[in-house]
């Protein structure tokens, strides 16, 4: 509710509100309750850190489930398909800023298009300080 109040004061209007939580901070079902109470409409936490792809087996949203009440939340899960650090980072797939990395992102994006799903991409803000990474991000978004 506080987020929406501040956004209203700033003139920010949008129909969807979502977020992503670092996996080390995630706690089921407490985190889901928090998002629900905050009025979020979707969560994009679920992904693999070490491999880009379909951790949830889908690129379509689905309702978050409350295991304590055996019911669905209003909150939707929007699976995170790719994170820049996973694909280009040395600690994970290690493709760097190469044509192979761009190809991997574009393959995943096309796989989502093929089934009319959503390609959810996480690109951390510090990565925009590097011109090559900005160019790769732009190529992915424009594709």
Annotate each PLM feature.
Residues 6-11, 99-143:
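C-terminal domain-boundary segment and adjacent tail
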């Amino acid at each position: 509710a506080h987020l929406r109040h501040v956004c209203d004061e700033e003139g920010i209007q949008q129909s969807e509100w979502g977020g992503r939580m670092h996996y080390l901070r995630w706690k089921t079902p407490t985190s889901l309750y928090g998002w629900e109470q905050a009025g979020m409409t979707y969560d994009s936490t679920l992904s693999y850190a070490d491999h880009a792809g379909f951790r949830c087996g889908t690129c379509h949203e689905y309702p978050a489930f409350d295991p304590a009440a055996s019911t669905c939340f209003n909150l939707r899960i929007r699976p995170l398909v790719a994170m820049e650090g996973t694909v280009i980072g040395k600690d994970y797939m290690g493709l760097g800023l190469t044509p192979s990395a761009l190809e991997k992102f574009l393959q995943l994006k096309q796989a989502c298009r093929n089934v009319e799903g959503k390609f959810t991409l996480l690109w951390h803000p510090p990565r925009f300080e590097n011109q090559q990474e900005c160019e790769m991000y732009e190529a992915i978004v424009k594709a």
